[in-house]
Regions:
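Bacterial N-terminal signal peptides
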Residues: 4-15
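Generic detector of short, well-ordered, non-transmembrane alpha-helical segments enriched
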Residues: 15-16, 219
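Serine-esterase "nucleophile elbow" of acetyl-processing enzymes
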Residues: 18-66, 81-93
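Alpha-helical cap/lid subdomain in secreted, periplasmic
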Residues: 22, 78-246
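Short, histidine-centered active-site or binding-site loop motifs used for metal coordination
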Residues: 31-33, 68, 101, 141-142
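Acidic/histidine-rich helix-loop elements
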Residues: 36-45, 65-74, 103-113
């Protein structure tokens, strides 16, 4: 009798079902500088660097995000092709662009919000699904920009709404980080929010001339906070990936 109970117990035990025999899904990140990896001597952090800490196995996260990239240049420079080549069935891909797509004054980088940008997102979704992997779209994180009255100013134009529209159209899970980070910055306020951003903190070599404060890129506490918001979204969406969250 015992020999028949053993396989049943093995099947029913959550701890054993997540054992070494099961390959955890891998999470691949496609995005820009707000998500990218940086050398540890650089105080700047992308939120993708902090995401692994929210999962049972930090090595699940593979960060392909590259500074300065848009949906156009991420493909053109070969990063998208390399990401696709690493995918295995059951993996997840989180796609976050917008910061550089909105630079339409730079034709080699920017994309039109009504045509090329959503078309590129559709391509990403289609090609990820063709690999039997799961795409997640993410809206771009908010910049720390407040007006004189202390009101947070949106800076991404129509790009977040374009992402939301593609997510609805193609039934793609959406991590609405523009909404979430905007709410977070409003809650922190003008002064308290400074500690999360590079601001005037030196990054790399000292500039030859004073630079404008950087209210786009994160220090470690900011990256950790955004990664936590992404993890909350994954849990709230009840995605299969959520079972691997701590």
């Amino acid at each position: 009798m015992i020999r028949f109970l053993i396989p049943i117990l093995l099947f029913c035990s959550p701890a054993l079902s997540l054992g070494a025999a099961e390959r955890p899904p891998q999470i691949h990140l496609a995005g820009d500088s707000t998500m990218a990896n940086y050398k540890l001597e650089n105080p700047q952090r992308g939120w993708g660097m902090a995401l692994g800490a929210f999962f049972a196995d930090p090595a699940m996260v593979h960060n392909h995000a590259i500074s300065g990239r848009s949906t156009k240049t991420f493909v053109r420079d070969g990063h998208w092709g390399r990401l696709l080549a690493e995918l295995q069935a059951g993996d997840f891909v989180i796609i976050q662009f917008g910061h550089n797509d909105e630079k339409v004054n730079l034709p080699k980088t920017g994309t039109d919000v009504a045509t090329e940008f959503p078309d590129n997102l559709r391509r990403f979704v289609r090609e990820v699904r063709a690999k039997q992997t799961v795409p997640l779209l993410a809206t771009p994180v908010a910049r720390r920009k407040f007006d004189r009255d202390g009101k947070l100013v949106p800076t991404h134009g129509a790009y977040p709404d374009a992402i939301r529209a593609v997510a609805r159209e193609l039934d793609v899970p959406l991590l609405d980080l523009e909404r979430d980070t905007s709410a977070w910055l409003r809650e922190e306020g003008v002064e308290a929010s400074k500690k999360f951003f590079v601001g005037v903190t030196p990054v790399g070599k000292p500039p030859t001339a004073p630079a404008a404060p950087d209210n786009t890129h994160f220090l470690e506490p900011g990256a950790q906070r955004v990664a936590g918001l992404a993890a909350q979204e994954i849990r709230a969406l009840n995605l299969p990936l959520a079972r691997w969250l701590k």
